[in-house]
Every structure is written in C-alpha cells, then in structure tokens.
Amino acid sequence: MPQVDPELFDRGQFQAELALKASPIAAFKKAIRLAGEVLDKRFRAGSEIRPLIEARAWLVDNILQQAWNQFDWGDQSGIALVAVGGYGRGELHPHSDIDLLILLGAAEHEQYRDAIERFLTLLWDIGLEVGQSVRTVDECAEQARADLTVITNLMESRTICGPEALRQRMLEVTSTAHMWPSKEFFLAKRAELKARHHKYNDTEYNLEPNVKGSPGGLRDIQTVLWVARRQYGTLNLHALAGEGFLLESENELLASSQDFLWKVRYALHMLAGRAEDRLLFDHQRSLATLLGYGDDNPKRAIEQFMQQYYRVVMSISQLCDLIVQHFEEVILADEESGSTQPLNARFRLHDGYIEAANPNVFKRTPFAMLEIFVLMAQRPEIKGVRADTVRLLREHRHLIDDTFRTDIRNTSLFIELFKCEIGIHRNLRRMNRYGILGRYLPEFGLIVGQMQHDLFHIYTVDAHTLNLIKHLRKLQYTPVSEKFPLASKLMGRLPKPELIYLAGLYHDIGKGRQGDHSEIGAVDAQKFCERHQLPAWDSRLIVWLVQNHLVMSTTAQRKDLSDPQVINDFALHVGDETRLDYLYVLTVADINATNPSLWNSWRASLLRQLYTETKRALRRGLENPLDREEQIRQTQSSALDILVREGTDPDDVEQLWSQLGDDYFLKHNAADVAWHTDAILQQPADGGPLVLIKETTQREFEGGTQIFIYAPDQHDFFAVTVAAMSQLNLNIHDARIITSSSQFTLDTYIVLDNDGGSIGDNPQRVKQIRDGLTEALRNPEDYPTIIQRRVPRQLKHFDFPPQVTILNDAQRPVTILEITAPDRPGLLARLGRIFLEFDLSLQNAKIATLGERVEDVFFITDADNQPLSDPQLCSRLQEAIVQQLQAGQGSDTSPTRVTF
C-alpha cells in the first residue's frame, strides 16, 4: 500500500478543514468524494489495478484513523480497530464492504460503549459501507471455533488503530494449535468450494457469471491462499510459488488473471454505482467499452470481452485445481499410502491416479501427451491425473506442433480415443482443460471461451461442443434413453459411432470466423479426415454431417411437414437411411447441448415425424414420391372407416367434407379428421364455438396439446384466439388455419404449457382452457387483443432490427412470410391484427422461440386465396409489421432487412 499519496488524501489539509467546521461530517464526505473521483480518473486513464485497490484501502485506513481520533477512548490498551476480510488483505473496490472488528481485551468494556456507538454512527453518517463486529479476544476464539467464515476473516487482519498486541493475542488463540488444524480447515474449504461451484452449475461459462463467486473467479484464488496460510503461513501468490506449489510462470499467469478480474470488478462497481459482482447483460456492453474492447459491431465487442473473461477464469480454474490437488497430496497424505502400479514404460498408477513414470516422459516421447488420455478412457477406474503430471503436461504442450500433428502415432492415438466405449467426453474435457486439445486441433483452440451474445446459446462454443459429445454418450444409458427413445435406439445401431463423435467435435468449429460456419467447419473436417487417414466413406459422412448439421432442425421447425413435397425434398437431400440415422441423432444431441430449455415435447415430435416420413419416402424410392392426391385419398379413406365403425352416417360426412379444401386433409391425419368430423356433426347449429382439446401423442416426452376450434369465421378471429391463449399461459408452436366454403373456420393449434410440456391428463386445466377460449371467441369484438406484459430484464438487452422476408413458394399457391424479431409479449396477436388489416388469410404457421428471438414462418394468401403478387402491397405489409414489432419492443431500431 502507498505510504503517502497527498493527491488522494492530505492529512494536514484534512485536519485543517476539520478545525474550521462545526461538524466533521461534511469534511469527511468531501474527502471521500474527491478521493473517489481521483481513483476513478486513474482507472479510466489506464492505471494498473493493484495500486488502485491498495490505494483505496489506504484511503479508508486514513479516514478510519481520523474518525477514530474524533473520540476519547481513555485507556486505549484494551481496544483496537482491526480490518478483516478483503479489507484486511488491503484490497478494496469502489463499493466493497469495509469489514471491521472492534477488538476488546477484556469482557468488561463498559467504558468504551459510548465511544463505539458514536464512532460507528459517524462512519454511517459519512457514507462508508461498513460491516462491523465488536468482540473480545475470547469471543473471537469461541466464534471462530464454530464458524468457518469467522476463522477465515480473522486470518486476514490488520490493525488500523490501537495496540497491535491485541490482534496478536487474537491470532494466537485462533491458531492451528487451538482450532482448525490445517487438515480440518482444508477439508472444510474444499467442501465450501465444491458447494459454491455447484451453485453456479459447476461451469466457468455462465452467461451472466459472478466475477467473485463463479468457478475460476476471485474466490477460487482466495480459497487456495486461505488454505496455504493455514498450512504454511503463506500470505500471497509469490510466497505460494516459493513453497513449490506454483512455478514462476504459473504464478505470473495467476497474478495477471487476478489483475484482469480485479479490473472487471472495479469497473462493475463504477458502472453499477454499488457493490455488483455479476456480469449482467445490463453491464456487459458498457464494460466492454470501458475496458477498451472496440469494434464497429457492439455485439462483437462484447463477445471479445467475454471470450477473454472466459479464458482467464478457465486459466484460474485450472491452476487452482492444480494447487488444490497438491494440497490434497500433501495435507491429506496417509503415511501408509503411496502404492504404485506400473501401466507401461511411461505411466503408472499412484493411489488410483495416473502419473508420469519420470519427469522426462513427455520430452522424450511426446506422443504420451495423447496416450495418457487414451489410457484413462480404456481404464475407467483411473480417478484422474496427479498434480505433478498435470504440470508436466502444461510445461510440454508447446511440443505439439505441425510435425506432432501429422505423426501417425499421434493421429492413431487421437482416433483411438473416439473408439473407446466410455470416457470419451471426460477425457476430451480434460484435454481441453489442460490446453492439449486446442494445441492438437488449432481450429478448436479458436473456439475456446467463445460466446455468442444471446440467450439461445447458453454455453461457449467449446463447452457446447463437449456437451454435445456428452449427450451422445448418455443416449446409451437410462433415464436419458427413456427420454430420447428413438435417438437412443439409433445411437446403439450406428455402424461406426466414432464418426458421429468426430462430426460432433467439428460441427460448430467454424464459428467466430467470417462466413457460414457449417461450410467452414466442413472444410476443417475434410482436412482433419485427410490428416488422420480416415477411409473415404467415413470422411464423406463426417464432412456431410458437419455441413448439414442444421438442416434437419431447420426443416422440422420451419417447413410444413404435412406437405409431401417437403418430405420428398428433404429425402432427396439426405439420400439414404444411414445418413438419416446419423443426422437425427446428431440433431437431437445438438439441440439439447445448445440450451436444455430449447428441447420440448413438440420439437421432439416434429423431429420424429420428419425422421419417420423421410424414412418411409426413402424406402418407397425417391423416384416414386407420394403425391398430394394420393395422400388425401388415403387420409379420407382411413378417416371414413373410423367414422363408419362408430356409426356415423357417410352421407353426413360427405356433405361436411365437401365444404373443406384439400389443405385440410393434407394437414391432418385420419384419426384427427375423424375426431373433428364426429364433433362437428354433433355440434348444435347455435351451440357457439366448438373447442376440442387432446394430446397429440401417447409417447412420454413427445408431442403437444392439440386445440381444435370450429366456429363461424369472424372479424379478428386469429388475433383474439392467440391473445386468449397468451392470457391462458399457453405457448403456440404450430397453427393450421382452414376456412370452409360455408365460411366456418377450422383452426388447429399445437400448444405447450409454460413449463415446455403438454397439458396432459389434467381435467381442471383442460376445462380452464376450453372455457377461456369459448368465452373469448363467443364475443371476439369485445376481447382485448394486445396483451400488456412486462418484458423480462434479460430480453431488454437483446433488441435488434426485425427481419421480414416475403417470398412465394414455387411449388405451392402460398406466400411465405418469415419473421425474425426480439421475443415480446403479444407478438402473434399484433401480427393477427395486421393480417386482418391487409385482408390476408393465414393458412399455416410455424412458431419457434429461440432464446431472446422468435423465428416464425407464416403461410399466407390474399382475399382470393392466392399468393401475394403486388410488390407495393408486400412493401406496405413489411412496413406495417416492422412498425408493430418496434412498438412491441418499446425501443427504436434500425431499418429491417427486407427480401422479396
């Protein structure tokens, strides 16, 4: 800490001001305010962070000493003001708590009571954010013995005012000779660290991480220092290196990483104007600017800043893991342990952990840097890597160069890892953590810590990739196999499962580079296959999967799967059943590894439908596709059989069906047609809207809830329907709109509840939905179609210009309207009003919410049931949609991207 810094605080000048003022409060406040401005100015000017946080602690020392001296303490030998915790370490950020201990020598301290109360009142009056306790030395010992947090705080202490002897007495009675021996303290701190990491999902890669508490955060560094202090009396990272727990290079890396997090935390406090350790979306853009991450694209600047953050915390996490493992081996060492078992000439087992047979293993035989991970995958009983060997890996990874990457021993070992029955994900994760994977595959190194600034991708690209591989592996185990039965079945019968793991490793590797990441990744995958001398068939499949890994999810979510042409086109693109099997499994794993909340029962049902229909088309033969007329005949014939068996008059059926167009029979299966027909024929002429509700499938974890509405076609019908569903907390995922020749609407909606599941067997909920919709549709003109709801905090930070695309389908008489926009309440109802205003008919809709954005596709026609053909009408429609969406956002955006 600085000895004297008159620009920050001049003692003589301050005391002179105190003498001139009747009340000291104004002088203290002025001194604190001016010093804060000086420190903030230094920060913005690029001052090093360590002197800044030490200078703030020095400033507070001086303020506290001046405040302490305002009171008559009498005999000061029995009282001391002690800094503890972070302030005790001499580290203070702009709004950090100032933790104080007023330490008393004896239980009888009545003579100090009045001065203590007045002193603490003054601190609050002058605006210091103080956390204080008043304890005797004996009380410190009693509470420290019972509370891990108390003993930790007392270990980091400094005397600010009063006799140092009191603090030394306190340190003596709380030493390892009396409580918390180093082994017990280490076990408690290790458990505390694990619990804290679990609170943050055991990942450094949260979208809104906590700079202090998340894995790899400042608290991890503090934890290893606390343990070292309890064991060795070591006070800082440099001293820790002196004890042999860190190499000098590791000490420098850990110190620079700590400085980076200190800068981020300091800036966070400045921007928030309060103690804030969470990297909320609210602050990420301002932080990126303040810390100097410049880019024409603000989103890209945020991603650059966050990538550095993630890489820093990953480094901290790796080094702290290494130190903690060293502590385990030293502090928890059992005199009778130490049994070793040779594995081969290069490695042995030591108490269940693998270690290098000698320090020169990786230098003499560099291929051992890959072999160690293959051995762990082949021997699942191996618990992990001993700390010294982890360090050897880190020290020798520079040997992984182009020569290493093309050595057949290394390429063979890497492929061998993917052929292991278990341990693929675990050991790829270790390779990534130790920095080996990014060295062996430089293209993978580019995506380490790379985030995408949105709510859809909740993991960095490298974490998502490894999660995908983990999900592929878990498909073979219950209960995961029960939730994904088809994917699990297909995974178990893939002829070469290692190929889907390799495709998964490369599927997003092209992200962060200019261009289509699927195409870039396919080029990288081709080079990988050539370097690893994979057979031609294997290479073609891997490259094709990387290039097309988004095709199946895009088709299922954005195309009309009831259209035979859509199925035939997709089947032509896939080509054969083997590719279809691989692609389906990869798609399921990709979606679930992107964002767990993205997967729902309806998306599962769509993918199964696309898989099943495509497989049927492939088996029928691509040269012999099913046409629309044949599909309509099959549906009508099967539905009529069901109705006749139930006693329905075929003439009544024929009369009703004659009023319906072909699209109705294309968009519904035979069972649903029979269900609808029976209910409509039994509906009284003046019975009001008919609302039917049922589940679309009996398979657990698949399907959605189907709501069928039959009613006279009325003004604002679609807008009222979707608004009512929104009020009922239903999420619409699919809509099929049919208008009969008798001007009745037959609308089918697929909905899910807010939890992402179908309504299921819940009579009360079904009745609530039926009653709510019936009431709204009975008098639609009286129902408010614009739903006013508060926009969630996170969504507010992801405004972007809406994108509206209008194009005509070359194979069907409809116009396709594609909308990508920020997710906002009431969006569908707003669009319904626009369709009404432009006299448009909605034929079908595919609704997808992806994080903070919606990607909706509407199939529309004009009043004559024809595709839109007037360019001026299309232009006005686009303009109206953009205006409505921007009104829903409540903020200005730049003009939309428009495509005809």
UniProtKB/Swiss-Prot annotation:
Residues 343-705 are annotated as: Uridylyl-removing. It comes from the Bacteria. InterPro entries: ACT-like_dom_sf (IPR045865), ACT_dom (IPR002912), HD/PDEase_dom (IPR003607), HD_domain (IPR006674), NT_sf (IPR043519), PII_UdlTrfase/GS_AdlTrfase (IPR013546), Polymerase_NTP_transf_dom (IPR002934), UTase/UR (IPR010043). The keyword Magnesium applies. Residues 461-583 form the HD domain. Residues 1-342 are annotated as: Uridylyltransferase. Has four distinct domains: an N-terminal nucleotidyltransferase (NT) domain responsible for UTase activity, a central HD domain that encodes UR activity, and two C-terminal ACT domains that seem to have a role in glutamine sensing. Belongs to the GlnD family. This is Bifunctional uridylyltransferase/uridylyl-removing enzyme. It comes from Pseudomonas putida (strain GB-1).
